[in-house]
């Protein structure tokens, strides 16, 4: 029997997930949708020829007994409310980041899920499903390079929109590194510091770009993360981990190499969608399969969403203060201690 999914938010990412569930993945079907723009929601149903009900809001969608699980792909500030309602309705819920716009909001979700006593919430940190990051994780878990000491990483975009602000460099951009790095090294963060190099001529007047974020873990690992969102040349994600006995590096996306007219070259991707499209597919398929086979989700947890929120809050504070700031996490609840989110 197919998992019956409702989608809350039919914008760009919502449509992408509807398309992959309908046309690429197995074991699920879209049976309900809702969006603040009802006309847009209806158009999505028609575009993908869905046998789905268009609901006026998330309350009515979640009240549908034919909905087993929901995808929350709406505007970020609306996520917390929809996720809390889904938990109370005993629905499985996949929520794109952010889980909530504040650490307090994430903690409310954590507490509600603990009350239920069952893992219902998965957060959309798709890099854990990228084959390159999975290879890094396997190498670290197998101690191929000994204990990790330092991590050098970069998150570069060709350009960003006029509404992109300095704090978004960590809240919207670096948040992916924040999640995947603590997963890779299995260590919590201790402190963060933000350094502003010389400003790029490509950055808009209101935006400080590039930025370097220095993160220290409780175990002493030092991470330097470059964020450069106006690099012009492409969408470029880098990660190099220096261990006691060697170095491992995130592989480049697969691409043909060209030898022509005295040059040797390979293409660089220009957007995040192409870079991580396979990871999105694996991520949503895992959400479906875990529910069908285990009756619980197995991807990034609500607690992971809380860690990301606390860490980005500390980064924003460091942007403003220019000082090293503490990452002050609450004690991890026992409920989440037994869950692993390592992908195979």
Curated annotation (Swiss-Prot):
InterPro entries, A to Z: Gfo-Idh-MocA_inositol_DH (IPR050424), Gfo/Idh/MocA-like_OxRdtase_C (IPR004104), Gfo/Idh/MocA-like_OxRdtase_N (IPR000683), MI/DCI_dehydrogenase (IPR023794), NAD(P)-bd_dom_sf (IPR036291)
pH and activity: Optimum pH is 9.5 for inositol 2-dehydrogenase activity.
Cited Pfam families: GFO_IDH_MocA, GFO_IDH_MocA_C
Gene3D superfamilies named in the record: Dihydrodipicolinate Reductase, domain 2, NAD(P)-binding Rossmann-like Domain
Alphabetized UniProt keyword annotations: NAD, Oxidoreductase
Intrachain S-S bonds: none
Gene induction: By inositol. Subjected to catabolite repression.
Keyword Transcription recorded: no
Reaction it catalyzes: myo-inositol + NAD(+) = scyllo-inosose + NADH + H(+); 1D-chiro-inositol + NAD(+) = scyllo-inosine + NADH + H(+)
Pathway membership: Polyol metabolism; myo-inositol degradation into acetyl-CoA; acetyl-CoA from myo-inositol: step 1/7
Gene Ontology BP term (one): inositol catabolic process
Gene Ontology terms, MF aspect: inositol 2-dehydrogenase (NAD+) activity; nucleotide binding
Keyword NAD: yes
Enzyme Commission (EC) number: 1.1.1.18, 1.1.1.369
PANTHER family: INOSITOL 2-DEHYDROGENASE, PTHR43593
Family: Belongs to the Gfo/Idh/MocA family.
Oligomeric form and interacting partners: Homotetramer.
Biological role: Involved in the oxidation of myo-inositol (MI) and D-chiro-inositol (DCI) to 2-keto-myo-inositol (2KMI or 2-inosose) and 1-keto-D-chiro-inositol (1KDCI), respectively. Can also use D-glucose and D-xylose, and shows a trace of activity with D-ribose and D-fructose.
Protein name: Inositol 2-dehydrogenase/D-chiro-inositol 3-dehydrogenase
Organism: Bacillus subtilis (strain 168)
């Amino acid at each position: 029997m197919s998992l019956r999914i409702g989608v809350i938010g039919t914008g760009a990412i919502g449509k992408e997930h509807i398309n992959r569930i309908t046309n690429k993945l197995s074991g699920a079907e879209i049976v309900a949708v809702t969006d603040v723009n009802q006309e847009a929601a209806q158009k999505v149903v028609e575009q993908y020829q869905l046998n789905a009900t268009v609901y006026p809001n998330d309350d009515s969608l979640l009240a549908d007994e034919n909905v087993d699980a929901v995808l929350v792909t709406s505007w970020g500030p609306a996520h917390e409310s929809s996720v809390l309602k889904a938990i109370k309705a005993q629905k499985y819920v996949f929520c794109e980041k952010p889980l909530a716009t504040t650490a307090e909001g994430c903690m409310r979700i954590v507490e509600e899920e603990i009350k239920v006593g069952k893992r219902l919430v998965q957060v959309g940190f798709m890099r854990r499903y990228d084959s390159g990051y999975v290879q890094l994780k396997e190498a670290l878990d197998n101690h191929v390079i000994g204990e990790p000491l330092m991590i050098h990483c970069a998150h570069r975009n060709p350009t960003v929109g006029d509404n992109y602000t300095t704090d978004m460099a960590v809240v919207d951009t670096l948040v992916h590194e924040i999640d995947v790095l603590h997963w890779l090294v299995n260590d919590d963060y201790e402190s963060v510091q933000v350094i502003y190099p010389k400003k790029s001529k490509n950055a808009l007047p209101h935006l400080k770009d590039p930025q370097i974020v220095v993160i220290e873990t409780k175990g002493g690992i030092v991470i330097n993360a470059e964020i450069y969102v106006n690099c012009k040349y492409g969408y470029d994600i880098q990660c190099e981990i220096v261990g006691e006995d060697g170095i491992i590096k995130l592989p480049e996306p697969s691409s043909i190499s060209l030898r022509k007219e005295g040059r040797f070259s390979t293409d660089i991707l220009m957007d995040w969608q192409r870079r991580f499209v396979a990871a999105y597919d694996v991520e949503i398929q895992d959400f479906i399969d875990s529910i069908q086979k285990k009756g619980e989700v197995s991807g990034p947890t609500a607690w992971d969403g809380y860690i990301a929120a606390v860490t980005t809050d500390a980064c924003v504070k460091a942007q403003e203060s220019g000082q090293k700031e503490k990452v002050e996490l609450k004690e991890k609840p026992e409920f989440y201690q037994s869950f692993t989110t390592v992908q195979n």
